[in-house]
Amino acid sequence: MNVHIFSSDLNAVFMLSVGAFLLSMALTPVYTYFAYRYKFWKKQRTTSTLGEKLEVFTKLHASKFDRSIPTMAGIVSLVAIAVITYCFNWSRAETWLPLAALIGGGAVGLLDDVINIRGKGSGVAGLRSSLKFAMITVLALALGWFFFVKLGYNSVQIPFVGVWQLGMWIVPLFVLAVVSTSNAVNISDGLDGLAGGLLSISYSVFGIIALLQNHLMIAGFCFTVVGALLSYLWFNIYPARFFMGDVGSFAFGTSLGVIAMLTNTLFLLPVIGVLFVAEAGSSLIQILSKRFFGRKVFISAPVHHHFEAIGWPETKVTMRFWVIGCVAGFIGLLLALKGGHI
């Protein structure tokens, strides 16, 4: 690789990231003005998806909800990313799909947040989980069709094995990746700074992979997201001034799944995002165990609440998860380098 060209590419990616960070910082006071004036307070969940009272969760986070912390701050990041991408990093082949996923996932999350703020909905104070799942699935199907028909993708790379030709079956695999990732990220957004930090790590790793693959515009998009997330983290680190809400978690999760497909690193996604897998997996295990065996595996799920329940301070859980996320990111990058993805 020509050193001068690579240096120029790095500069371009760096400028996109800085631009997203600065624009997000500039837009944040606008959001906070409206959020506090019109009381975008996040309503506390009182019951689980099975209809049971969340006694442990309520006890752990009672003081947080007493502070009336606004939600829906993810919309700031979405606006900044959309503006920077459309103005400086637009490509039908590389950035249209992840941006569409970001906006589409954000729209689903926004609807859920609005219902949550208005205090309607049962138990989880928002859209029913089944309805959110259906909406994200429909979005993923539309994106998967574009991925296969318009962009011509029809295979996946399996580390250390080779290319697996799927033809039209790439679409259901695409849907599985996007729906799973969006829900896993949404489940992980439960502690101050947790989801924002883990997403920053994951997008950084995928950005490096894309850069090494010479997908400059995908790399630029990834680091645009990182810039916006770092701006959000400035205010979301404990004690959080606001939450990203479902508008953020669904947007970033949906787009992350698309990035994994575009960089042909789907099978590295569970490694790089291992904590997203652990969070979603712990919730699923808890639900299945209570439904079929009548007992809980974890004191509280997802797993970050379990660690809180056994006495870990919220900040310790978050920072240790960040450390694990960094290690997983390095392992994923190494697998990408050695497994034939670059």
Feature locations, PLM:
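Hydrophobic alpha-helical segments of integral membrane proteins
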Residues: 31-34, 114, 288, 299, ...
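Solvent-exposed interhelical
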Residues: 190-198, 295-318
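Loop-to-transmembrane boundary segments
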Residues: 66-76, 310-321
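Juxtamembrane boundary at the C-terminal end of a transmembrane helix
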Residues: 151, 331-342
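Juxtamembrane non-transmembrane "cap" segments at the membrane-aqueous interface
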Residues: 40-48, 280-300
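"…together with the soluble PPM/PP2C metallo-phosphatase catalytic core" -> "…together
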Residues: 2-277, 342
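Final/C-terminal transmembrane alpha-helix of multipass membrane proteins
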Residues: 316-336
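Peripheral (non-transmembrane) domains and long loops of multi-pass membrane proteins
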Residues: 7-8, 12, 16, 308, ...
